[in-house]
């Protein structure tokens, strides 16, 4: 049985119409923050703190980051999906939905810190918009990809790697606001995926864009992906805050 990557707590995210005579609350442009290479725990703590302290006036943000090697296990995840206990890669238990996945250099990780009530977004709609953004990004590099019913993420559509997973997603919804997000494999060491059942699926092949013979620049793909996410969310221009450049890493 598949496990949803979305974990919902507290208030539901469905939004009713504004009271009669009350104007709709405008949706502010998304601020994009490029956080560089950052330890997973630092990103995890920061997005929880951001979500816990945000108010109705807090703007939505998208964080783009690259993590050192780490496995993350969702709150309902089964530790048995970590097949090699002494792999040398740390395991962090987190509060998103879903099972186990791997993050590492050469992978784009995007966290979506969104007020779903203000945006009048149902969770399923948000997941669809995220998946569409990844599919559109890969299409920009002439890679055909698809979603699978009951198995959130994005998969290779055809060829020798048909059915292999190239992107994963997992969200947490708290008080109508999302955090966590998605990961897209660009050019990375894929061997750590062999030590897990990716997203809880035994034998699931995981690939990156390089495996599909696409020599893509990490930063270029990241900018394409963020652009598609914003366009799919609301079509607004992002207010990009770039405190330091992300470094491409192929190790």
From Swiss-Prot:
GO terms for cellular component: cytoplasm. Its main location: cytoplasm. Substrate binds at residues 96-103, 168-170, 181-183. It is found in: Cytoplasm. Its EC number is 2.3.1.181. The record marks 165 as: Lowers pKa of active site Cys. Keywords: Acyltransferase, Cytoplasm, Transferase. Transmembrane segments: none annotated. Pathway: Protein modification; protein lipoylation via endogenous pathway; protein N(6)-(lipoyl)lysine from octanoyl-[acyl-carrier-protein]: step 1/2. Catalyzes the transfer of endogenously produced octanoic acid from octanoyl-acyl-carrier-protein onto the lipoyl domains of lipoate-dependent enzymes. Lipoyl-ACP can also act as a substrate although octanoyl-ACP is likely to be the physiological substrate. NCBIfam families: lipB, PRK14342.1, PRK14343.1. This is Octanoyltransferase. It comes from Burkholderia cenocepacia (strain HI2424).
